[in-house]
Amino acid sequence: LSNIVVLDHIQDTNNFGAIIRSAAAFNFNIVCLPKKRSVNITERTFAVSSGGLENVSIVFYNSIFSLIKKLKALDYWTVGLEMDTEEDISNVNLNDQKVALFIGSEESGLSNEIQKKLDLISKINMDNKIESLNASVAAGIAMNHFFKKSS
């Protein structure tokens, strides 16, 4: 099985398309998103993904908590991206384990309830001139990290 990206209530079509594009580029062959309260696949998604949608499977889930449980049962290492944590993603080495990367909403990130269920919460180290990265940029950096570690 391949690496997976799990989106939790991403709302912006451009972010969604860019995440799909990065997922295809870095061998994250499945993108999961909630059935409700999430972005839709639109013509804009196709355009921004630049062919990524043809190389990535989109899977819808009902409950993120059930999904986390299923992924762990399939031996995925569940990793969330957040700003307020000590663990720098560049130090994370999962020794070729399958990764399920969790990306929270643009507004509020991953909820504390979700974070508690994941194996690891990590951040992208950056200069403090900027408070945060765009969700699709952060997702792309994290996917590239795991792609390089598995190459």
Regions found by a protein language model. Name each.
Residues 35-39, 61-65, 109-113, 131-136:
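Short C-terminal domain-edge/linker segments immediately following a structured domain
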Residues 1-86:
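RNA substrate-binding interface of SAM-dependent RNA methyltransferases
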Residues 79-134:
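Active-site/ligand-binding-proximal alpha/beta "capping" segment
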Residues 51-57, 98-104, 147:
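Short, structured secondary-structure boundary patches
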Residues 19, 110-113, 142:
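Conserved sugar-transfer catalytic core signal across GT-A, GT-B, and GT-C glycosyltransferases
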Residues 25, 46-52, 115-151:
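Structured adenosyl-cofactor binding patch, chiefly the S-adenosyl-L-methionine
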